[in-house]
């Protein structure tokens, strides 16, 4: 199958009721191809944004997924040392203010088990490796491990934003470096409006225990909460298939404020199924 992918990471700070700031990196675009046999897929991507000299040359995303009827697995990493664009702060919106004082490195491993594997197929709506003949849903549970390192240098913010920040945050450095171990739980549903069509929705929460540094010199335990929403649509005709998926991950970090750190990924795929034997 061939694939086109667009992704972006974002951060939202909620300092208090009157001080909120949002930032997002430019979307990174790539095209690639996969060869999939049963639950294993091998592929290669070409970064279009890098070839065309886009702003996001220092961004990278790596993602490997495994699917079967009963379980799915995922290994991923996200790196951004290229900065972001501040899109809003206070009552000002639709901004385009460069901010280079950020560095983030995140990687993780996840395994998810589907409670109703005989009637519900995760692959039908998200990897297009199987067919869903009737509408059906399933609860899901899993385990998640994540290494998260994020650094914000607020002294690099534009002067007008530094003056707007609460006094204790002006010129501050916000840094977190640790690991998260969590248990995931959620529900997925595939709707089959007519033969050959599948629309899938998944929602999960991942409460996690974090051990690491958060603006201190000593490691501490803290609580983290991750949220995930996946939406997919697939069309199948004989051995041909095409579809689109949209996935969003958001992690909530609490430290005298709330930081929402997340990723948006949109993919379009098309391909042909064949039998080796």
Q: Predicted segment positions?
A:
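Transmembrane beta-strands of outer-membrane beta-barrel pores
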Residues: 4-10, 37-41, 46-50, 68-70, ...
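Surface-exposed strand-loop-strand hairpins of Gram-negative outer-membrane beta-barrel proteins
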Residues: 7-30, 41-55
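Outer-membrane beta-barrel transmembrane domain signature
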Residues: 8, 148-230, 234-239, 250
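Residues on the lipid-exposed face of transmembrane beta-strands in outer-membrane beta-barrel proteins
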Residues: 31-37, 62-68, 109-115, 141-145, ...
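Outer-membrane pore/translocation modules
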Residues: 63-176, 247
